[in-house]
């Protein structure tokens, strides 16, 4: 009996020793996973952006592009984010939605601009998506949902069906709660650093949770960002713990009105 117990202990210790040794190996460096992922991300970002633009034409009107660029640039400057790494695309689509793509592509649907109650509300959503980009949530989620092999196949001639599947995941699947909360809190920090009032971001969350948007049937953002009321509440709690600032309007009233009027004609 003692011999059997001793053999069992030896096997357990051997297993633990092998496990410990394997844990200490830099598998990412050995297999160049990071490099592979970066290369894949660049190709994937371009591929998916093309998929979405084919479905919804990109808006190039200065009435829309300039105000959006102003918001994004202001946030990037205030938070030491490389503006050239954030590639913004405003698409003509009535869905109330915005989402991040690999390689820093940020898609904003005109329906979101139309539904937003203020430039500050819109800024909150934009900052939330920028946070997903800066925190590398996009590729983490795609690898988790689909696997690296599927992503690689899409960039090496895997076919439009694979790209379409990935695009569907990004535009219609929620990040997990932990990543969403991290992006929310990061977004509030970005807003405050840029001297943009973060409370309208929480107001937007409250409003969509009640289905009070101008076009509730198109509230795609709420389907990919669930628990909006709960998130609005912890955003407000987080803001309360910060020093109050004298926030300035993120856009001139005339620029906001022009942009709203433009997208209204497209809805």
Residue ranges of model-derived segments:
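A Zn2+-metalloprotease active-site environment signal
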Residues: 1-267
